[in-house]
């Protein structure tokens, strides 16, 4: 849900309402956030090896979501400060600010996925992960609807209230979700995992793993390229208010959730995973072409349909 505020509201406000250059917005909200993903693999290994207070995952998750929430609550003030004086020094400081948010987000996310692995058997892991992703889509849809209703009329004070409330709600839900999920252990021995270098070497030596990693990287990068620019695109090209562009996340979430359900329940049993993933990629390509066409036609109806189609393709992928 926090991603809706960060990548669905803040990026649009920074560009359209505050007038920051889109390159700066992309650098801060896009690069700053997603560069945090670089810590995911080494941090997962780090949390395997080191407990905090007897916990291998819980403390890392709480620390990550706390830092993320704090930065999100402060981000409207940082955005306005930067808009008043977008000097290279200020842009650099803001980049570090948003990079910390990205690192904290991926620290919490990596530890949470590791906790799921710890709590489930190999047979349970697939359904559990699928349920988590489905509920995440539900959270995006609900947050998108709620944020759009709250931002019907944009003011800076309303934006601050929205971001502060969202941060507090996310922290509260995280604490509730984590309650008694991990037992505290201090001295219990735990099997030592392979070193990070050895794990990466194993990945590099496997042709199948290399090809899959490259495919996944290219596919995810291609899909997430729209994350930073979609809402500013709706605001500048179509003249849509913040409430309407915030709903883009709802349309996308409906498409992704529908694609996951359609693929998992209907298509994969009949066509296989490779064909369904390929179908999802072609749908994403068609959706991006539709986004381009909608810009020339200035049709908001085509735009909404195309965003939903983009989510459907991503869900199948």
What residues fall within each predicted segment?
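Pair of pore-lining "gating" transmembrane helices in MFS-fold secondary transporters
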Residues: 1-17, 99, 204-226
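Short amphipathic helix-loop junctions that connect adjacent transmembrane helices
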Residues: 8-24, 228-246
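Glycine-rich segments within core transmembrane alpha-helices of 12-TM secondary carriers
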Residues: 32-37, 126-151
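C-terminal ends and interior cores of transmembrane alpha-helices
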Residues: 61-88, 282-298
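Juxtamembrane intracellular "pre-TM" segments in multi-pass secondary transporters
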Residues: 184-213, 237
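C-terminal transmembrane helical hairpin of 12-TM major facilitator-type secondary transporters
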Residues: 274-317
């Amino acid at each position: 849900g926090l991603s809706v505020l960060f990548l669905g509201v803040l990026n649009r406000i920074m560009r359209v309402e505050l007038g920051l250059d889109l390159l700066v917005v992309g650098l801060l909200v896009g690069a700053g956030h997603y560069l945090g993903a670089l810590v995911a693999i080494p941090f997962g290994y780090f949390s395997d090896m080191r407990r905090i207070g007897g916990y291998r995952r819980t403390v890392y998750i709480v620390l990550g979501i706390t830092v993320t929430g704090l930065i999100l609550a402060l981000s409207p003030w940082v955005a306005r400060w930067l808009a008043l004086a977008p000097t290279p020094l200020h842009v650099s400081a803001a980049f570090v600010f948003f990079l910390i948010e990205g690192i904290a987000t991926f620290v919490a996310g990596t530890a949470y996925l590791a906790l799921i692995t710890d709590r489930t058997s190999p047979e349970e892991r697939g359904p559990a992960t699928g349920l988590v992703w489905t509920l995440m889509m539900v959270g995006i849809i609900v947050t998108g609807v709620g944020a759009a209703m709250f931002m019907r009329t944009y003011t800076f004070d309303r934006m601050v209230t929205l971001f502060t409330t969202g941060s507090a709600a996310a922290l509260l839900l995280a604490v509730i979700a984590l309650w008694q999920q991990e037992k505290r252990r201090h001295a219990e021995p735990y099997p030592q995992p392979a070193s990070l270098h050895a794990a990466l070497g194993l990945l590099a030596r496997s042709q199948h793993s290399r090809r899959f990693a490259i495919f996944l990287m290219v596919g995810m990068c291609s899909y997430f390229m729209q994350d930073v620019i979609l809402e500013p695109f709706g605001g500048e090209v179509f003249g849509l208010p913040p409430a309407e562009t915030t709903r883009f996340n709802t349309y996308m979430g409906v498409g992704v959730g529908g694609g996951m359900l359609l693929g998992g329940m209907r298509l994969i049993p009949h066509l296989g995973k490779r064909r369904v993933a390929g179908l999802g990629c072609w749908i994403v390509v068609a959706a991006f072409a539709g986004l381009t066409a909608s810009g020339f036609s200035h049709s908001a109806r085509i735009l909404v349909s195309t965003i939903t189609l983009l989510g459907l393709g991503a869900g199948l992928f």
